[in-house]
Amino acid sequence: MPHVAFDGWTQATFEIARKDVGLSEGDAQLACPRKELDLICAWSRQLDEEAGKVIIKADLLSMKIRERITFAVLERLKRVNRHEEAARRARARLLLPDAASDAPQLLWATADTIWRAVGDTSTDVNFYSKRAILSAVYGSTLSSWLNEDDTAKPDAHAFLDRRIQNVMDFEKTKGQLTRMTADLPDLEAMLGKIRHGAGL
């Protein structure tokens, strides 16, 4: 991490790290064929795992769902506190074209870790919508977190609160729409019948 903070996530710093831990070139290639990119991904997964363990041990039952998510997101964000510059450099590296698919995958993995840790058991479309929404919330809050010099992160906390409120408002509106349209014809079923040649 010290090398990354100064020189960024590059193949050169990967080679320095490899030599620091005494890993052969062959073993390093097997472990991280994409060198620094695979190292970033491994680091993110490690932070997910660390945060997940803390979240699971918390008294989640005493919290409302909004409080659980806020707590869980903050626990994950705190994992980068020791290496904020490395996290900034990782974010910059993930913006390059060869990492186009990595950033969204890592955000999704973080969101999945958080939802599972707080006890989410959804398996339907909600499984995907929850993770997609939380990925956006976490990603934007991480940017706010890393851009704030104050170690207490008051602006990032406030930003997270606003984002989660937006999500809660959306879910409330979605619930109202679901109730309003409950008695309408099932369009999906109708289309399915048409597709398979069944009459209405």
Regions found by a protein language model. Give the residues of each.
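Short, amphipathic alpha-helix enriched in basic
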Residues: 1-26, 34-41, 45
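Hydrophobic alpha-helical connector segments
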Residues: 54-89
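Internal, conserved structured core segments that host functional sites
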Residues: 75-110
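Hydrophobic/aromatic-rich alpha-helical bundle segments in the mid-to-C-terminal region
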Residues: 120-182
